[in-house]
Amino acid sequence: MAELKSLAKDTAIYGASSIIGKFLNYFLVPIYTFSLPAASGGYGVITKMYAIVALLLVVLTFGMETGFFRFANKGDDDPKKVYSVSLLMVGGVSLIFLLLCLVFLNPIAGLMGYGEHPWYLGMMLIVLAMDAIQAIPFAYLRYKKRPIKFAGLKLLFIFVSILLNILYFVVMKGDDVGVAFLINLICSFVVMLGLIPEFREFRYCPDRLLMKRMLYYSFPILILGVAGIVNQVG
């Protein structure tokens, strides 16, 4: 009974943080709508960029969050080793992807319609890499049953984002869409700092067999995730 109550409490905290986060994010829509000039693309620039980021985030994490839970709870492997291997794979892929994109930033930005402002794309690529890497420590927090820190960091991101957006777009009457992406970058970095204790638990222990097993399990989740995002933003 005690375990059931604990599970219900943890689930409520995770769910509440998600609901509150989405609710607070709605406050940003009218701020962007009324502050961003139509000549610069307005709020559409932000929605387009975030749709791309959402899709790429699913690709870069390739179902490894679920894979981590599966293998950490299975009991056949050391959970800390599973965590380290998961973080190594997602972190390695994300950093390589980021490096390649930054090297070819200008042509990629041109193809995507951001040729005049490649730094928009550059900032969001850094955000994308950080968010992908953060996914594993957040999954680790859930595995360790630490819902307060999990929810606290998620809400910290939202509150800092809203505060900075209000400061720039409402108080300072700013209208540069690039600042919205810069704020997102700042917030993601703040969350990275909050996850430092979890990153310190990483140990470099590449295990090819474990990697193959986890990838085999996670690949179908990647396909479902991509399909879900395409259906959501399509």
Positions of PLM-derived features:
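Residue-level recognition of transmembrane alpha-helices
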Residues: Y14, S18, T47-Y50, V90, ...
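Hydrophobic transmembrane alpha-helices of multi-pass small-molecule transporters
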Residues: K22, Y26, L55-V58, L98, ...
